């Protein structure tokens, strides 16, 4: 049975971020994920996690200057020092929070820039992260973002991500399989799951096309959950969706998994 993690950046947004941990626990979640923890001291977050009996299972490296169109910086040529700083900061938080996975964000590729140069820069920075994280058993996740959500992102398809994972060639670097993005770009999710089996170590879900609860839209998530059980997937399933209304009202789908 899947181990579901509430995404606290997107869910329970009826209350401030630090109050979402309690809300998730009351709703029956044992695991949480979020995009970025860096606005808060790690020890404060750890105390809140412990208070509510929660485990954080994933967060991202810093996004960079979002106001300038950045969305990650680990693929930007000439910014390797910044990338290493972000990777090191994420490691500090992962160790303090006991988080087993970190998503290393690549970057948006500007019009006219060389995607190959960005890719090679990303590969080098991910190898740096791999060496830093390996002694602690922390897994590195790389994620494709569909063009509808993030135009010109370096990784668009699950196969873009798989290519980078294979070129990095380290045993602690994996595909982060977000079925929302995968359906938008790749489709054929059952066969995709088989093709990526053993290469992905974190899953995220949301309906397509509206990115709501996983009980509507194009994807038959019960089939996907059964497929994950069939292949022996033991990682976490992050609920990275935008609730249709109040978060708790939309959790009927989750009741049988508590």
Swiss-Prot record:
InterPro entries given in the database record: HPT_OtnI_isomerases (IPR053398), HyI-like (IPR026040), Sugar_Epim/Isomerase (IPR050417), Xyl_isomerase-like_sf (IPR036237), Xyl_isomerase-like_TIM-brl (IPR013022)
Role: Catalyzes the isomerization of 2-oxo-tetronate to 3-oxo-tetronate.
Annotated binding of Mg(2+), by residue: 143, 178, 204, 240
Record has Isomerase as a keyword: yes
EC identifiers of the protein: 5.3.1.35
Reaction(s) the record says it catalyses: 2-dehydro-L-erythronate = 3-dehydro-L-erythronate; 2-dehydro-D-erythronate = 3-dehydro-D-erythronate
PANTHER family, sorted: HYDROXYPYRUVATE ISOMERASE-RELATED, ISOMERASE
GO biological process: glyoxylate metabolic process
Homology family: Belongs to the hyi family. OtnI subfamily.
Keyword annotations from UniProtKB, A to Z: Carbohydrate metabolism, Isomerase, Magnesium, Metal-binding
Pfam family, any one: AP_endonuc_2
Species name: Haemophilus influenzae (strain ATCC 51907 / DSM 11121 / KW20 / Rd)
Name of the featured protein: 2-oxo-tetronate isomerase
Main EC class the enzyme belongs to: isomerase
GO molecular function, one term: hydroxypyruvate isomerase activity
Location of the active site: 143 (proton donor/acceptor), 240 (proton donor/acceptor)
């Amino acid at each position: 049975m899947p181990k579901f993690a509430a995404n606290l950046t997107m869910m329970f947004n009826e209350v401030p971020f630090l109050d979402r941990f309690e809300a998730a626990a009351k709703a029956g979640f044992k695991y949480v994920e979020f995009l970025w923890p860096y606005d808060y001291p790690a020890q404060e977050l750890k105390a809140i996690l412990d208070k509510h009996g929660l485990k954080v299972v994933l967060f991202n490296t810093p996004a960079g200057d979002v106001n300038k169109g950045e969305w990650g910086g680990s693929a930007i040529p000439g910014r390797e020092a910044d990338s290493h700083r972000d990777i090191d900061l994420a490691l500090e938080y992962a160790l303090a929070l006991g988080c087993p996975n970190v998503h290393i964000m690549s970057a948006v590729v500007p019009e006219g820039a060389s995607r190959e140069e960005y890719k090679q820069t990303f590969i080098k920075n991910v190898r740096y992260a791999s060496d830093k994280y390996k002694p602690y058993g922390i897994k590195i996740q790389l994620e494709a973002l569909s063009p509808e959500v993030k135009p010109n992102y370096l990784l668009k398809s699950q196969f873009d991500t798989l290519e980078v994972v294979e070129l990095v060639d380290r045993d602690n670097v994996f595909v982060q399989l977000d079925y929302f993005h995968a359906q938008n770009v790749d489709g054929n999710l059952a066969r995709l799951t088989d093709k990526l089996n053993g290469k992905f170590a974190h899953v995220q879900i949301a309906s397509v096309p509206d990115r709501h609860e996983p009980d509507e839209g194009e994807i038959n998530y019960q089939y996907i959950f059964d497929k994950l059980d069939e292949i022996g997937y033991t990682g976490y399933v992050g609920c990275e969706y935008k609730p249709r209304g109040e978060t708790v009202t939309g959790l009927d789908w989750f009741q049988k998994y508590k």
